[in-house]
């Protein structure tokens, strides 16, 4: 569990190290606000994305299921600045095992609420789905803008990073993978 008191002290000291007066009017509550914000933003640290699949059903459905444009935000573990974008998840049920659609979005939410790398986030979402449903195929695509590339360093706002993970049928069969990509990219 996060230690809010310890976080507040560290933020207070950080403000001092910047040369600021943490006791001035505009900053006196900042350590508390920032600590509470980080506790919320990193709330996925003590959760498992796989545990979000609480509703698994046996249906007579053997065709692809796609949930796309799932908005998310996360924090780059290298610079502790946000990256945000959309996740797209496709899976081909195995023996008719399907899940509630919101469970896919919840898995993204939990996996993204921690210091993270986009590549790892993509893999964690795919692994959670594989563990929960054991589908015939999984395809996860995440596209995001990273503030560490927008606000600092190279300063290229609007640039997007795309990561994918393909498993099962979507890894082994190039035609099937192309079909999923085409469906995801349709407006």
Curated annotation (Swiss-Prot):
It catalyses: GTP + H2O = 7,8-dihydroneopterin 3'-triphosphate + formate + H(+). One of its GO terms (molecular function) is zinc ion binding. It holds the Pfam family GTP_cyclohydroI. Pathway: Cofactor biosynthesis; 7,8-dihydroneopterin triphosphate biosynthesis; 7,8-dihydroneopterin triphosphate from GTP: step 1/1. Zn(2+) binds at residues 76, 79, 148. GO terms for biological process: one-carbon metabolic process; tetrahydrobiopterin biosynthetic process; tetrahydrofolate biosynthetic process. Its EC number is 3.5.4.16. Gene3D superfamilies: 1.10.286.10, 3.30.1130.10. The keyword Oxidoreductase does not apply. Signal peptide: none annotated. SUPFAM superfamilies: Tetrahydrobiopterin biosynthesis enzymes-like (SSF55620). Keywords: GTP-binding, Hydrolase, Metal-binding, Nucleotide-binding, One-carbon metabolism, Zinc. NCBIfam families: folE (TIGR00063), PRK09347.1-2 (NF006825), PRK09347.1-3 (NF006826). HAMAP family: FolE. Belongs to the GTP cyclohydrolase I family. This is GTP cyclohydrolase 1.
